[in-house]
Each structure stands twice: as structure tokens, then as C-alpha cells.
């Protein structure tokens, strides 16, 4: 060994910059460096070490000299030191042996860096964040974790955690040039380790940030990221194969929307994999939709203010337990849709906001970068790396969790620059308009990428305006979504039902108007969580009248939804008419169905169960949802009696007549025109006793005769009980 005094010293300014984590190239100081053709220097910093030795590849052991500030160094033989290990003698007597974190090449290649800066890296989670990695060296395999983070405005970045006493001086990262990415491979750190990134700004501030790409996070209110790697073995090959060939336009889709923390409070992902899956299967739904399951700091946001886009929330278990839940749904024949929130994110100091001291993920101008109503930041959709972060995140949930659909939240807030903004609070686009052109491009790219890479996966827009082409293909200039929530239908329908039956005749347009635009987009009919919060009450309380009328109203409402063109969605608890408004802080009120007082609620639940079974067995109710040939009115103008009827036509030639009486009077002999003569069989009556109805006028078969009526060549006469709906199947 050569004395350290013969080593050219590192400049004090560099050592100081390293100590305060404001140096871009720690690998240029620490690690192994050639001195001349025969010698090399090994230099390392280990805070709290008493002695450090290096074990060379020829089995030589060399002690490194302490040169101050926890730095140890020695000159060693060049050939024997190309690979080495460090033996660290810590204060207190502990001895550890490890590879040197500063003796490895970058774990990101040039192609990775190019794709990231172009915004085109579709597997971003495999190269950024914390990825457990094994690197093969001359002295054997080295297990550890490759860390990488995008922080282009930082003056220095370090990995911190219990493994270094949360001291950023121990593991500063290197900057990979103009890419803005900082990288470091740390040996002997693996799955389960809590970590953060210490971001140092040019203004001298230190920001301890959770990893934007973390695959697991601590349970809130803790904010650390956790190194994670999946060991889950999927058992849904058949489901995934069949999904790729599914045409959702022409298949049944009945969605049960769920907040996992309140469906039955206290259950984790693994318990829900039995209890929730069994319930959804028993009820006959085709799909379940989770309110956001990405990590979020505030439970009261229901998951819509995301801090960890790649980390399933730890409130209800581990990422692999979530995989188990989704797998269980697939094995039960049920698809899984997840709410996804690319519109905005919270301002919590540990998360994405001002990530490297400046606006990074958010737009730098507050007139585009903040959503004042929600107190959140808005993503900078025009920035390549940000767009890549979001598109890759969509793919991540599809790839890593086998999710079958993404319901994209708050799309309208993305599309319009003046969304919920007063004059002077927004910036127009380059053409002077209010359309957010960058957000449009992002949504088109996301949808095109998802549909190309994962055939059969759905993307569903929550879009509350009349923006054209939401569900039109991107190659036609549309946004490219598979479906769109029909907010207009939902608002008009609930407004109509909120009136006393005697007054509904004055609001008849509310219940018929939806068919004017029913085929302008591909729609989902949503009675979602948004309709049972913020003082709106439950669907039960929004029905007028006493308990009998409320129950009859809900039964009729649900039958109308299932018969109307469009896919169906119902939020948890509404399937049995929960009385109280929903709260994320408590379980559903399953007790509403108990005892004699619960008979109406049990009846509603039975009706929804029967509607799901009937719906799935009736192509007329779903196979032409997006084809005008799948629908015709048979009575749309009887406002005085609050009666509505129409026929749904299946692609297989089947036909179902839907008849609704939204009023309070029975109609024992009501004549309707129909497209076919012969027998029409009653397959559902919401007034039946099994649903706790009055059991009045229960037709089983009705004959249509060759008598012209209302423009049809055939007609029939039906009994229509007050506040009820009936479905009749044509049997020729």
C-alpha cells in the first residue's frame, strides 16, 4: 500500500460540496480511480465508521487510511483492485462487508435516457425509482437496489433512510448529464427498506421527497417510500387471453363501484379477495370499479389526490395483496376497473409539488399549474417527461396489476384552460382559445398507447361537457376513450325523480332528452359516489314520499337504467337503497336490510340481482348500445300520465319492450304500439312481491295483435302499476 499522503488530494471545495450533497459527480471522487498504469486509489466515505478495509480480488486485504470527514482512502495495486469489497468496522463493534456503491456503471443505458427525454419510455417504472437489482462482478453477484430520479433543477440529490441515519452525505447520487436524472446503485439494500430522496436546491434548501416512482409507500400519515418487488404468481391466464378479444361495445357491462376502505371497514385486500369478490359475483355484476387505489395522504380525498402514482395504497395491504384481489375477481369472471387521476395532484410537501425546488411536474404558471377549487397542482402536459410519467403509469397498472380498465377522473378540468377559473385566472392557448391543446395531445397519446399495447382494455372518461369526439378514435381526431360517463343523463334523470309524481308531467323532457344525443358518444350510465356525498343524501333520500314510495321509486329508477342504452354503473350501498349519505369513515349500512323495517331494502337488492342476471342474458339490452337501430320509442309523449315505453333490439334479432310508469296512478289497460305481433312475455316487473312491491297487475304473457297504433302495425294492452317498470321479451 502507498501512503495516502502520496495521493493527490481532492479539492476542499469538492469535499465540502459532497458533504452538503451539492456535487453532481460523487463517482468521480469516491470509488476506484486509476492513478497510473500500476496503481489505483480507492476512496470511500462511511459516516460512523472507525476503520475501513478493502478486500481485493487477489484476496489481499488493505486498510484504508482515515483522512478526515469520515473519508477513507488508499492506493492499491491496479490489477488486483479492479473489483473489491469494503469491510467496515463501525463504532460500537459491528462489522459489515459490502461492495462499493461508487464502483458501478449507471444502471440506465443511453437508450433509456433518450426515450425518457423524448417522453416515450413505456416501461418507465423499470428504470426510474427503486429497483432491486443483481449485478455480476468478478468477485461474485452483488445484490442491491438501483435508484434513479428525475430532478433536473437540483444541485444535488441523495438517497436517505435508516440505512444511513437519514444523512444525505452518505449516499449522494450522480447526475446523468443534461437528462436531469440522478442515479445510484446501493448494495445490500433490498425489499422492505424505507427510503426517500434528499433534494438539494440551488438556493441551499433541502427537500426530503417520496419517490415519484415508488412501488410501495408507508401507511399514512408516514410518507416514506418502500423498496418493493413482486413475487406474485397470477392465475388469470384464461381471463387475460379472452379479454384481448372482447368487444366491449357489444357486450354486457354492469359495474359495481367500490371504495375499498368503506365497503366493509377493516378488511384488507386479502380479506376482500374473498368477501367482496363473493358478494359481487352473487349480485351478478360483470365488473367492479375501485375508487383510486394509488397512494394518497388524505383519506377524505377518497384517493383522488394522489401522492404515489405507482404505489397501491398501503392502507389495505401490500401490492401483492392487491394483485391477489384483482386475480380473484378475474377467476370469478369479473373485470376490474380502477379510477385514475392524471388531472391534478396535491401540494403536500413530501410529494410531487415543487419536486426539485421548482415547478417540475406542475405547470410553472399558476394560471395553468394550479386548480384553486381543489387546492391542487395541475400537471404540465406539454412537458415530455411529465407526459411520459403519466402514460407509463397507465401502462403500469395494466401490466403489473392486470387492470381491465381505467376510469379517467376530471377530464373536463384537463380539456379547458378556463375550467372553474375567473377572467384573468387562465391563459389561452397559442390560438387564443380555451382548449388545453397539450392535455388533448396527452389524452390521445395515452389512449392510443393503451389500446395498441393492451387490446380489450377500456379507458372511460368522466367528462361533464359536450366536448366532441371523446369516444371517437384518435385517427379521426377524437380523444380515443372507449366510453364516457353520461353525466347529462344522470343529472336529468335524478332531477326528474326528485319531483313528486304529480309534478313530473312538467319535467317530462328531463326523462326523454337523453335519447336526442344517446349515440353521439359511447356511454356509461353512472349513479356514482359523486351522487351520494356533499349533502346530496343517498339515492333513497332523493326519492320523494314515504318508505313505500322511495322503494318503488328506486326500483323503477334502476329498471329504467338497465333498459336505457348504455352500460350501467351503481355505487356501493345503492344496490340496497342505503338510507344515509355515504361516508368513507364508516362501513356501508348493511343493517338497513335487517328486520321487518329492512324489507324494502332487501327487495331493492333482490331486484338489482335479478336485473343483472336478466341484463346479461338479454342481448337486446346491450348488443346495440351504440347503434341507433337498437332502440325505438313506442311511447315518449304521454307526459300527463308519466308513462314512457320503448323497444330495445338485439344484434341477434331479439326484442325487449320496456314500459315505465313514473306516476302514482295504476293503468290497468294501457295500449302500446309494438314492432312485432305475437306473444310478449313479461320477464321483469318491479312491482312484484319478491321486490316488496304491491303485486298488482302482474302480466305474464301479453299478445300483440295486427292493429295499427302510434305508427306501428301491431299493438298490445298492458297493465301498468303505479311507480313501476316492466320488461317484455318478444317470443314470436
UniProtKB/Swiss-Prot annotation:
Known pathway: Glycan biosynthesis; glycogen biosynthesis
Catalytic activity from the UniProt record: Transfers a segment of a (1->4)-alpha-D-glucan chain to a primary hydroxy group in a similar glucan chain
Keyword Transferase attributed: yes
Entry's Gene Ontology BP terms: glycogen biosynthetic process
GO cellular component: cytosol
Record EC number: 2.4.1.18
InterPro entries (UniProt xref): A-amylase/branching_C, Branching_enzy, GlgB, GlgB_N, GlgB_N_E_set_prok, Glyco_hydro_13_cat_dom, Glyco_hydro_13_N, Glyco_hydro_b
Family matches, as Pfam families: Alpha-amylase, Alpha-amylase_C, CBM_48, GlgB_N
Record flagged with keyword Transferase: yes
List of catalytic residues: 409, 462
One MF annotation (Gene Ontology) recorded for this entry: 1,4-alpha-glucan branching enzyme activity
Regions crossing the membrane: none
Keywords: Carbohydrate metabolism, Glycogen biosynthesis, Glycogen metabolism, Glycosyltransferase, Transferase
Subunit relationships: Monomer.
Family assignment from sequence similarity: Belongs to the glycosyl hydrolase 13 family. GlgB subfamily.
Role, per record: Catalyzes the formation of the alpha-1,6-glucosidic linkages in glycogen by scission of a 1,4-alpha-linked oligosaccharide from growing alpha-1,4-glucan chains and the subsequent attachment of the oligosaccharide to the alpha-1,6 position.
Protein name per Swiss-Prot or TrEMBL: 1,4-alpha-glucan branching enzyme GlgB
Species name: Corynebacterium diphtheriae (strain ATCC 700971 / NCTC 13129 / Biotype gravis)
Amino acid at each position: 500500500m502507498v501512503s495516502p499522503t502520496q495521493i493527490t488530494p481532492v479539492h476542499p471545495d469538492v469535499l465540502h460540496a459532497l458533504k452538503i450533497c451539492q456535487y453532481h459527480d460523487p463517482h468521480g471522487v469516491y470509488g476506484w480511480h486509476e492513478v497510473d498504469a500500476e496503481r489505483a486509489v480507492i476512496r470511500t466515505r462511511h459516516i460512523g465508521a472507525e476503520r475501513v478495509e478493502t478486500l481485493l480480488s487477489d484476496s489481499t486485504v488493505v486498510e484504508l487510511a482515515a483522512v478526515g470527514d469520515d473519508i477513507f482512502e488508499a492506493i492499491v495495486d491496479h490489477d488486483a483492485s479492479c473489483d473489491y469489497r469494503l469491510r467496515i468496522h463501525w463504532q460500537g463493534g459491528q462489522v459489515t462487508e459490502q461492495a462499493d456503491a461508487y464502483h458501478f456503471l449507471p444502471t440506465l443505458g443511453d437508450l433509456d435516457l433518450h426515450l425518457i427525454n423524448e417522453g416515450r419510455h413505456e416501461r418507465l417504472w423499470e428504470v426510474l425509482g427503486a429497483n432491486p437489482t443483481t449485478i455480476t462482478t468478478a468477485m461474485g453477484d452483488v445484490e442491491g437496489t438501483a435508484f434513479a430520479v428525475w430532478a433536473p433543477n437540483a444541485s444535488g440529490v441523495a438517497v436517505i433512510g435508516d440505512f444511513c441515519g437519514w444523512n444525505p452525505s452518505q449516499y449522494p447520487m450522480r447526475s446523468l448529464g443534461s437528462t436531469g436524472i440522478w442515479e445510484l446503485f446501493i448494495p445490500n439494500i433490498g425489499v422492505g427498506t424505507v427510503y426517500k430522496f434528499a433534494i438539494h436546491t440551488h438556493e441551499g434548501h433541502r427537500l426530503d421527497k417520496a419517490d415519484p416512482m415508488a412501488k410501495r409507500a408507508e401507511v399514512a400519515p408516514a410518507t416514506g417510500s418502500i423498496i418493493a418487488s413482486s413475487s406474485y404468481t397470477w392465475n388469470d391466464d384464461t381471463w387475460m387471453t379472452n379479454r384481448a378479444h372482447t368487444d366491449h361495445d357489444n357486450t354486457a357491462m354492469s359495474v359495481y363501484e367500490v371504495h375499498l376502505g368503506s365497503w366493509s371497514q377493516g378488511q384488507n385486500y386479502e380479506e376482500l379477495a374473498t368477501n367482496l369478490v363473493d358478494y359481487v359475483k352473487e349480485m351478478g355484476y360483470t365488473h367492479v370499479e375501485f375508487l383510486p387505489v394509488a397512494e394518497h395522504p388524505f383519506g377524505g380525498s377518497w384517493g383522488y389526490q394522489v401522492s404515489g402514482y405507482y404505489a397501491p395504497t398501503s392502507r389495505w395491504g401490500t401490492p401483492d395483496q392487491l394483485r391477489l384481489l384483482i386475480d380473484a375477481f378475474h377467476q370469478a369472471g369479473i373485470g376490474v376497473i380502477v379510477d385514475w387521476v392524471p388531472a391534478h395532484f396535491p401540494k403536500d410537501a413530501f410529494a410531487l409539488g415543487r419536486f426539485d425546488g421548482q415547478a417540475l411536474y406542475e405547470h410553472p404558471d399558476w394560471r395553468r399549474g394550479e386548480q384553486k377549487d381543489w387546492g391542487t397542482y395541475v400537471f404540465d402536459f406539454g412537458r415530455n417527461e411529465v407526459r411520459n410519467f403519466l402514460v407509463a403509469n397507465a401502462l403500469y397498472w395494466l401490466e403489473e396489476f392486470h387492470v381491465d380498465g381505467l376510469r379517467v377522473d376530471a377530464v373536463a378540468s384537463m380539456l379547458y384552460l378556463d375550467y372553474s377559473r375567473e377572467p384573468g385566472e387562465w391563459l389561452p392557448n397559442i390560438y387564443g382559445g380555451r382548449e388545453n391543446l397539450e392535455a388533448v395531445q396527452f389524452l390521445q397519446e395515452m389512449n392510443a398507447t393503451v389500446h395498441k399495447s393492451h387490446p380489450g382494455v377500456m379507458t372511460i372518461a368522466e367528462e361533464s361537457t359536450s366536448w366532441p369526439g371523446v369516444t371517437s378514435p384518435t385517427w379521426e381526431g377524437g380523444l380515443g376513450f372507449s366510453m364516457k360517463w353520461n353525466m347529462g343523463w344522470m343529472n336529468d334523470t335524478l332531477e326528474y325523480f326528485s319531483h313528486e309524481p304529480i309534478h313530473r308531467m312538467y319535467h317530462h323532457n328531463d326523462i326523454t332528452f337523453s335519447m336526442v344525443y344517446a349515440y353521439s358518444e359511447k356511454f356509461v350510465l353512472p349513479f356514482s359516489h359523486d351522487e351520494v356525498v356533499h349533502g346530496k343524501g343517498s339515492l333513497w333520500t332523493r326519492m320523494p314520499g314515504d318508505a313505500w314510495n322511495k322503494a318503488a321509486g328506486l326500483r323503477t329508477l334502476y329498471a329504467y337504467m338497465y333498459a336505457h342504452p348504455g352500460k350501467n354503473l351503481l355505487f356501493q350501498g345503492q344496490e340496497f337503497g342505503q338510507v344515509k349519505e355515504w361516508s368513507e369513515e364508516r362501513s356501508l349500512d348493511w343493517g338497513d336490510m335487517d328486520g321487518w323495517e329492512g324489507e324494502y331494502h332487501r327487495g331493492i337488492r333482490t331486484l338489482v340481482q335479478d336485473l343483472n342476471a336478466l341484463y346479461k342474458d338479454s342481448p337486446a339490452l346491450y348488443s346495440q348500445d351504440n347503434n341507433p337501430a337498437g332502440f325505438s320509442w313506442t311511447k315518449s309523449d304521454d307526459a300527463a300520465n308519466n308513462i314512457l315505453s320503448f323497444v330495445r333490439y338485439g344484434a341477434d334479432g331479439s326484442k325487449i319492450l320496456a314500459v315505465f310508469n313514473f306516476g302514482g296512478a295504476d293503468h290497468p289497460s294501457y295500449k302500446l304500439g309494438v314492432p312485432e305481433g305475437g306473444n310478449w312475455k313479461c320477464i321483469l316487473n318491479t312491482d312484484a312481491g319478491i321486490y316488496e312491491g304491491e303485486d298488482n297487475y302482474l302480466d305474464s304473457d301479453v299478445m300483440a295483435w295486427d292493429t295499427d297504433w302510434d305508427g306501428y302495425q301491431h299493438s298490445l294492452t298492458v297493465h301498468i302499476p303505479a311507480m313501476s317498470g316492466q320488461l317484455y321479451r318478444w317470443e314470436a
